[in-house]
């Protein structure tokens, strides 16, 4: 079973004191203010054989997301909707404590949060993925790979997922005596997306709340809370991690800060996606 770096990366006490002393001055190891996000870089169509893909770099954190579409049957309880299946893998090359094998509880948690943010925000219109109502629909496989764990991997996973979905090509569907089949030689459009969604994570270290914690900061944090937002700043997901607690005042302050950061992050995401 893999362990997250925030649980395993041991920071010497003297270094923790150094980091916190910087917080007292309103700055951080990398020169950021407490409310600053790390530089974001998105490379679209990175995996050429996927139907859509995006490589996201958030500081030293690197995440690759790719999509594959296939014709499938709808779920019984949603006969008039397509399917979205999200998987996240923490690759062994991303951090020394990550192990080969099936996804562990940390990867499963990441996948669930990303999935919930996409569904609850209705970023992807699943009703427009129907080929024949009740019989045939598109299933969107969204696979997310953490390539380098430099902290705040959840935000990076959400960004990579959204970018890959916007990059996804939809191919022509043809029907013959055997049913429906995909004609990979003809692209008919893109996935029916309504809007992007972003996640903003804020860590608490002692009495300080910091945006987009890096690996060292996660290693000394008491707890962390993540908020997912639509462009109209509707909250569509909240996730807490870490063993510590937050007061209601901390949560209110964290959400107010996250909301302001989300505005800038959504603008940057739209700019890099060209939407």
Curated annotation (Swiss-Prot):
Record's function text: Non-catalytic component of the exosome, which is a complex involved in RNA degradation. Contributes to the structuring of the Rrp41 active site.
* Organism for this UniProt entry: Saccharolobus islandicus (strain L.S.2.15 / Lassen #1)
Localization terms from the record: Cytoplasm
In Swiss-Prot or TrEMBL terms, this protein is called Exosome complex component Rrp42
Question: What family does this chain come from, according to its entry?
Answer: Belongs to the RNase PH family. Rrp42 subfamily.
Domain of life, per UniProt, equals: Archaea
GO CC entries: cytoplasmic exosome (RNase complex)
PANTHER family for the chain: EXOSOME COMPLEX COMPONENT RRP42 (PTHR11097:SF8), EXOSOME COMPLEX EXONUCLEASE RIBOSOMAL RNA PROCESSING PROTEIN (PTHR11097)
Subunit relationships? Component of the archaeal exosome complex. Forms a hexameric ring-like arrangement composed of 3 Rrp41-Rrp42 heterodimers. The hexameric ring associates with a trimer of Rrp4 and/or Csl4 subunits.
Keyword terms, alphabetized: Cytoplasm, Exosome
Q: Name one GO biological process term.
A: rRNA catabolic process
**Pfam families assigned to the protein according to its UniProt record, in alphabetical order:** RNase_PH, RNase_PH_C
């Amino acid at each position: 079973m893999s362990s997250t770096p925030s649980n395993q990366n041991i920071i010497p006490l003297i270094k923790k004191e150094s980091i916190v002393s910087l917080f007292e001055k309103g700055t951080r190891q990398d020169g950021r203010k407490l409310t600053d996000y790390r530089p974001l870089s998105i490379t679209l169509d990175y995996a050429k054989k996927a139907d859509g893909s995006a490589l996201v770099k958030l500081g030293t954190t690197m995440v690759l997301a790719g999509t594959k579409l296939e014709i499938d049957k709808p779920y019984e309880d949603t006969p008039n909707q397509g399917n979205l299946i999200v998987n996240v893998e923490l690759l062994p090359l991303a951090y020394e404590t990550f192990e080969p094998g099936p996804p562990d509880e940390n990867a499963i948690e990441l996948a669930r949060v990303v999935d919930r943010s996409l569904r609850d925000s209705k970023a992807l219109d699943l009703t427009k993925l129907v080929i024949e109502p009740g019989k045939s629909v598109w299933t969107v496989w969204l696979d997310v790979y953490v390539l380098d764990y430099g902290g705040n991997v959840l935000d990076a996973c959400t960004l990579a997922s959204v970018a890959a979905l916007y990059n996804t090509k939809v191919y022509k569907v043809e029907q013959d005596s055997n049913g429906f089949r995909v004609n990979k030689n003809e692209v008919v459009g893109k996935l029916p997306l309504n809007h992007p969604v972003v996640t903003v994570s804020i860590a608490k270290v002692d009495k300080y709340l910091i945006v987009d914690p890096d690996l060292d900061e996660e290693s000394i944090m008491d707890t962390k809370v993540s908020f997912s937002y639509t462009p109209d700043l509707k909250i569509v997901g909240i996730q807490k991690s870490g063993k510590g607690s937050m007061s209601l005042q901390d949560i209110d302050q964290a959400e107010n800060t996250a909301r302001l950061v989300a505005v800038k992050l959504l603008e940057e995401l739209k700019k890099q996606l060209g939407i």
